[in-house]
A protein has these predicted regions:
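Sec/Tat signal peptide C-region and signal peptidase I cleavage site
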Residues: 19-23
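Bacterial N-terminal signal peptides
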Residues: 9-18
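Bacterial N-terminal signal peptides that target proteins for export
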Residues: 1-9
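A generic "folded-domain core" signal
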Residues: 24-196
Length: 196
């Protein structure tokens, strides 16, 4: 009895799968039901950020405006040990007062302990401490005035360590690596874009 039942079961299974395959073939959709996609316009529109160039670990990011020259900044995202983006460093051309030649913003998470401030140490040089200026929806901002000495150390350095403290763990500093690979070329491109 078992052999007969398994034979009929196998035959029934084969017939059902064959019927399903025929039904699937009969109901196969026509090619015109599928989209081949459209090419998106790669030209940025007003108010969009776009990448003007990449220099090592730095990106020259610009904002499309109605001006003859779009404002740009040199940007790098810094990541935690697990690879998650944590903070942004963006360098901006400024109207120099003779001492400060460039301005940078370091944007950290809202949960940053502001009273501990932020430190930046390029390679084995002495660290500098900077206050946070304000917080906004996307994070808290420390505004960094870069002197000629600072710019020279960025150009000749390999990396900077940026240290901040989470409010939830005020005794556990978060140290982020800012790569200086490509900084010299990126800074030159930023200043060239600002002058044009």
């Amino acid at each position: 009895m078992f052999k007969v039942t398994s034979y009929f079961g196998a035959l029934l299974s084969l017939l059902l799968s064959n019927t399903a395959l025929q039904a699937q073939t009969a109901q196969m959709p026509a090619a015109e039901e599928f989209s081949t996609g459209e090419v998106l316009n790669s030209t940025p529109v007003m108010g969009d950020y776009y990448v003007k160039g990449t220099f090592g670990d730095w990106t020259l990011r610009c904002l499309k405006t109605e001006q003859a020259q779009d404002p740009c900044q040199l940007v790098q995202l810094m990541h935690s040990a697990d690879g998650s983006p944590v903070a942004e460093y963006n360098l901006n051309p400024i109207q120099s007062d003779g001492l400060v030649l460039a301005g940078a913003n370091v944007i950290t998470p809202l949960e940053t302990l502001l009273t501990q401030q932020l430190t930046i140490q390029v390679d084995d040089q002495n660290a500098k401490i900077y206050p946070f200026a304000f917080c906004m929806q996307m994070g808290c901002v420390a505004r960094i005035g870069l002197t000629q000495e600072d710019l020279d150390s960025y150009r000749s350095g390999a990396q900077a360590i940026i240290t901040m403290f989470p409010a939830a763990a005020p005794t556990q500093p978060e140290r982020l690596t800012l790569s200086l690979k490509g900084f010299t070329a990126g800074h030159a491109a930023l200043m060239g874009a600002a002058e044009n």
